[in-house]
Regions:
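A sequence/structural signal for flexible, mid-protein segments enriched
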Residues: 1-224
C-alpha cells in the first residue's frame, strides 16, 4: 500500500474565472505518483422568497421547516486528475489544477453566489497504478481529433481464475486517502457577478382574490 501524504493546501485565483489548485509534498520523496478527486457543494438562494404555499385549494403560510429560499447543490469530479514528480529532485506538487468555475452559465455563476465548498481527496499511487490511470485518461478523454494519441492497450492486474485465457481489464491498488476542505464566501470574491432577474423565472403579479383560481390551473400545483 502507498502511504499518501497530507494535502498542504488548496488555493484559488480569480482573474475572471475562479481556478482552484492543490498543493502537496512528501518529505521522504517516496510517493511520486498522485491522483485527485473532489466534491463540490454550494449554497445559493432562490430569486424570490416563497412565504406562502397552495394546498387543497387554499393559500396558506409556509412553515419554517418548508422554506425553499436557501438551497444547496453538490457535484463531483468527472475527469481523471493525475500528477507525478518522478522527473523532479523533490517530491513536491504545486498549483496542480483541480477545476475552474466559469461565468459562462447561471449554473456555474450560482456556485459562488453565497458560499462554496470543495472537498479534495488525494491518493498516492504506485507507478503501475499511475500508468493504468494515465492510459485510461488518454483513451477516454483525449480522443476525437487528428492530433490526439491513439487508444492504447490497457494494463491490468486482474485475472480470471476460471478461464486464464480470458482477458480482464482493471487495476486494483491499495492506498490511504487524505483529504481537505475549503470554503469560499461570495464576500471573498466581490467582483463575481450575480444573476439578475432577467436570468431567473418570471414574476406574475395579481391580487389575492384571483390567486387561487390562477394556481388551480397552474400545472405545478394541478398536474394533468
Amino acid at each position: 500500500a502507498v502511504l499518501t501524504p497530507e494535502i498542504d493546501s488548496i488555493t484559488w485565483k480569480q482573474p475572471d474565472e475562479l481556478n482552484l489548485f492543490v498543493h502537496t509534498h512528501d518529505a521522504s520523496n517516496s510517493t511520486r505518483y498522485y491522483r485527485w478527486e473532489y466534491e463540490e457543494t454550494w449554497e445559493y438562494n432562490s430569486w424570490f422568497e416563497a412565504t406562502l404555499d397552495f394546498k387543497d385549494g387554499q393559500i396558506v403560510s409556509r412553515p419554517p421547516e418548508e422554506q425553499v429560499f436557501t438551497c444547496w447543490r453538490s457535484d463531483s469530479s468527472e475527469l481523471i486528475n493525475l500528477g507525478n514528480t518522478s522527473a523532479l529532485t523533490q517530491d513536491v506538487i504545486s498549483y496542480q489544477p483541480l477545476t475552474t468555475i466559469t461565468q459562462a452559465s447561471s449554473f456555474e455563476r450560482n456556485k459562488l453566489s453565497v458560499r462554496y465548498s470543495i472537498l479534495v481527496k488525494q491518493l498516492g499511487l504506485t507507478k503501475e497504478a499511475y500508468n493504468f490511470w494515465n492510459i485510461l485518461k488518454k483513451n477516454t478523454e483525449l480522443t476525437g481529433t487528428l492530433f490526439d494519441p491513439q487508444p492504447s492497450r490497457m494494463p491490468s492486474n486482474i485475472k480470471c481464475t476460471t478461464d486464464p485465457g480470458r482477458e480482464s481489464i482493471g487495476f486494483i491498488s491499495v492506498g490511504k486517502i487524505t483529504q481537505q476542505r475549503i470554503f469560499i464566501r461570495h464576500s471573498a470574491v466581490p467582483s463575481w457577478p450575480l444573476l439578475d432577474e432577467s436570468q431567473t423565472c418570471s414574476k406574475v403579479t395579481m391580487n389575492s382574490i384571483d390567486a387561487p383560481a390562477y394556481l388551480q390551473n397552474d400545472p405545478f400545483y394541478s398536474p394533468v
